[in-house]
Amino acid sequence: MAPPPPSPPSVTLRTVLLLLRVLTAAFLVITVVLISTNTVTLEVSSTSIKMRFNDVYAYRYMLSAAVIGLLYAVVQLFLTISQFATGTTHPLNYQFNFYGDKIISYLLATGSAAGFGVSKDLKETFLALIEFDSTDPVDKFFSKGYASASLLLFAFVSLAVLSVFSSLALSKRPIQVS
Protein backbone atom coordinates (compact mmCIF):
# COMPACT_ATOMS: atom_id res chain seq x y z
CA MET A 1 0.00 0.00 0.00
CA ALA A 2 1.35 3.41 -1.01
CA PRO A 3 1.92 6.03 1.65
CA PRO A 4 -0.52 8.92 1.66
CA PRO A 5 0.53 12.01 -0.29
CA PRO A 6 2.12 14.76 1.77
CA SER A 7 -0.25 17.35 3.09
CA PRO A 8 0.10 20.68 1.27
CA PRO A 9 1.60 23.55 3.22
CA SER A 10 -0.86 25.75 5.03
CA VAL A 11 -2.18 28.88 3.35
CA THR A 12 -0.17 31.05 5.74
CA LEU A 13 3.08 29.25 4.92
CA ARG A 14 2.36 29.44 1.19
CA THR A 15 1.71 33.17 1.55
CA VAL A 16 5.03 33.65 3.37
CA LEU A 17 6.85 31.67 0.67
CA LEU A 18 5.20 33.73 -2.06
CA LEU A 19 6.12 36.99 -0.31
CA LEU A 20 9.72 35.85 0.10
CA ARG A 21 9.88 34.96 -3.61
CA VAL A 22 8.48 38.39 -4.54
CA LEU A 23 10.93 40.08 -2.17
CA THR A 24 13.86 38.17 -3.69
CA ALA A 25 12.78 39.12 -7.22
CA ALA A 26 12.34 42.78 -6.21
CA PHE A 27 15.81 42.96 -4.69
CA LEU A 28 17.28 41.40 -7.81
CA VAL A 29 15.44 43.72 -10.21
CA ILE A 30 16.70 46.76 -8.33
CA THR A 31 20.23 45.30 -8.25
CA VAL A 32 20.23 44.70 -12.02
CA VAL A 33 18.98 48.23 -12.75
CA LEU A 34 21.38 49.86 -10.30
CA ILE A 35 24.53 48.06 -11.38
CA SER A 36 23.82 48.17 -15.12
CA THR A 37 23.34 51.96 -15.07
CA ASN A 38 26.48 52.59 -13.03
CA THR A 39 28.85 54.85 -14.99
CA VAL A 40 31.18 57.72 -14.18
CA THR A 41 33.25 60.17 -16.22
CA LEU A 42 36.64 61.04 -14.76
CA GLU A 43 38.47 64.26 -15.57
CA VAL A 44 42.16 63.58 -14.97
CA SER A 45 44.68 66.19 -16.19
CA SER A 46 42.42 67.42 -19.02
CA THR A 47 41.63 63.87 -20.13
CA SER A 48 38.10 62.52 -19.93
CA ILE A 49 37.80 58.83 -19.04
CA LYS A 50 34.40 57.11 -18.95
CA MET A 51 34.23 54.19 -16.53
CA ARG A 52 31.35 51.74 -16.75
CA PHE A 53 30.32 48.86 -14.53
CA ASN A 54 31.51 46.37 -17.17
CA ASP A 55 35.05 47.72 -16.88
CA VAL A 56 35.23 46.03 -13.47
CA TYR A 57 35.18 42.22 -13.62
CA ALA A 58 33.63 41.81 -10.17
CA TYR A 59 30.75 44.10 -11.15
CA ARG A 60 30.20 41.97 -14.25
CA TYR A 61 30.10 38.88 -12.06
CA MET A 62 27.70 40.62 -9.69
CA LEU A 63 25.41 41.52 -12.60
CA SER A 64 25.58 37.96 -13.97
CA ALA A 65 24.72 36.52 -10.56
CA ALA A 66 21.80 38.95 -10.21
CA VAL A 67 20.44 38.16 -13.70
CA ILE A 68 20.69 34.39 -13.16
CA GLY A 69 19.08 34.81 -9.74
CA LEU A 70 16.33 36.94 -11.25
CA LEU A 71 15.56 34.34 -13.91
CA TYR A 72 15.38 31.67 -11.22
CA ALA A 73 13.20 33.91 -9.03
CA VAL A 74 10.75 34.54 -11.88
CA VAL A 75 10.46 30.80 -12.62
CA GLN A 76 9.95 30.12 -8.92
CA LEU A 77 7.34 32.88 -8.72
CA PHE A 78 5.32 31.21 -11.45
CA LEU A 79 5.65 27.80 -9.78
CA THR A 80 4.71 29.22 -6.37
CA ILE A 81 1.69 31.06 -7.77
CA SER A 82 0.65 27.85 -9.53
CA GLN A 83 1.00 25.88 -6.30
CA PHE A 84 -0.90 28.58 -4.43
CA ALA A 85 -3.76 28.52 -6.96
CA THR A 86 -4.07 24.75 -7.30
CA GLY A 87 -3.08 23.72 -3.79
CA THR A 88 -0.93 20.88 -5.15
CA THR A 89 2.79 20.50 -5.60
CA HIS A 90 4.43 18.44 -8.34
CA PRO A 91 6.75 15.82 -6.76
CA LEU A 92 9.78 17.11 -8.69
CA ASN A 93 9.24 20.63 -7.33
CA TYR A 94 10.57 19.55 -3.95
CA GLN A 95 13.97 18.69 -5.40
CA PHE A 96 13.95 21.65 -7.80
CA ASN A 97 13.26 24.02 -4.90
CA PHE A 98 15.84 22.35 -2.68
CA TYR A 99 18.75 22.31 -5.14
CA GLY A 100 17.81 25.53 -6.93
CA ASP A 101 17.50 27.54 -3.72
CA LYS A 102 20.86 26.25 -2.47
CA ILE A 103 22.78 26.84 -5.71
CA ILE A 104 21.31 30.24 -6.51
CA SER A 105 21.65 31.50 -2.94
CA TYR A 106 25.37 30.68 -2.96
CA LEU A 107 25.72 32.38 -6.34
CA LEU A 108 24.06 35.52 -4.94
CA ALA A 109 26.27 35.43 -1.84
CA THR A 110 29.46 35.23 -3.90
CA GLY A 111 28.25 37.99 -6.21
CA SER A 112 27.55 40.22 -3.24
CA ALA A 113 30.94 39.47 -1.69
CA ALA A 114 32.69 40.25 -4.98
CA GLY A 115 30.85 43.56 -5.21
CA PHE A 116 31.71 44.58 -1.66
CA GLY A 117 35.35 43.59 -2.07
CA VAL A 118 35.99 45.36 -5.34
CA SER A 119 34.11 48.48 -4.26
CA LYS A 120 36.24 48.78 -1.14
CA ASP A 121 39.56 48.05 -2.87
CA LEU A 122 39.02 50.23 -5.92
CA LYS A 123 37.63 53.13 -3.92
CA GLU A 124 40.69 53.10 -1.66
CA THR A 125 42.95 52.88 -4.72
CA PHE A 126 41.27 55.82 -6.41
CA LEU A 127 41.42 57.84 -3.20
CA ALA A 128 45.15 57.09 -2.87
CA LEU A 129 45.91 58.09 -6.47
CA ILE A 130 43.72 61.14 -6.87
CA GLU A 131 42.22 63.53 -4.35
CA PHE A 132 38.46 62.91 -4.28
CA ASP A 133 35.83 64.00 -1.82
CA SER A 134 32.44 62.55 -0.94
CA THR A 135 30.63 64.64 -3.58
CA ASP A 136 32.80 63.40 -6.41
CA PRO A 137 31.22 61.21 -9.14
CA VAL A 138 33.77 58.47 -8.42
CA ASP A 139 32.47 58.21 -4.88
CA LYS A 140 28.93 57.93 -6.25
CA PHE A 141 30.09 55.20 -8.66
CA PHE A 142 31.42 53.08 -5.82
CA SER A 143 28.44 53.94 -3.60
CA LYS A 144 26.19 52.47 -6.30
CA GLY A 145 28.45 49.41 -6.26
CA TYR A 146 27.99 49.13 -2.50
CA ALA A 147 24.22 49.60 -2.83
CA SER A 148 24.01 46.90 -5.51
CA ALA A 149 26.08 44.51 -3.40
CA SER A 150 23.85 45.24 -0.39
CA LEU A 151 20.67 44.51 -2.33
CA LEU A 152 22.24 41.32 -3.66
CA LEU A 153 23.04 40.37 -0.07
CA PHE A 154 19.40 41.00 0.92
CA ALA A 155 18.28 38.80 -1.98
CA PHE A 156 20.66 36.11 -0.72
CA VAL A 157 19.22 36.31 2.80
CA SER A 158 15.62 35.98 1.60
CA LEU A 159 16.60 33.09 -0.68
CA ALA A 160 18.52 31.46 2.17
CA VAL A 161 15.36 31.58 4.30
CA LEU A 162 13.47 30.01 1.39
CA SER A 163 16.21 27.38 1.23
CA VAL A 164 15.48 26.40 4.82
CA PHE A 165 11.78 26.00 3.97
CA SER A 166 12.60 23.92 0.88
CA SER A 167 14.89 21.70 2.98
CA LEU A 168 12.10 21.14 5.49
CA ALA A 169 9.57 20.44 2.72
CA LEU A 170 11.90 17.89 1.12
CA SER A 171 12.61 16.16 4.43
CA LYS A 172 8.89 15.88 5.26
CA ARG A 173 8.05 14.46 1.85
CA PRO A 174 7.55 10.67 1.98
CA ILE A 175 10.03 8.57 0.03
CA GLN A 176 8.47 6.94 -3.00
CA VAL A 177 9.64 3.43 -3.75
CA SER A 178 9.26 2.31 -7.34
UniProtKB/Swiss-Prot annotation:
Residues 36-60, 171-178 are extracellular. The chain crosses the membrane at residues 15-35, 61-81, 150-170. The keyword Lyase does not apply. GO terms for cellular component: plasma membrane. It is found in: Cell membrane. Its main location: membrane. Keywords: Cell membrane, Membrane, Transmembrane, Transmembrane helix. Residues 1-14, 82-149 are cytoplasmic. It comes from the Eukaryota. It is a multi-pass membrane protein. Belongs to the Casparian strip membrane proteins (CASP) family. Homodimer and heterodimers. This is CASP-like protein 4D1. It comes from Arabidopsis lyrata subsp. lyrata (Lyre-leaved rock-cress).
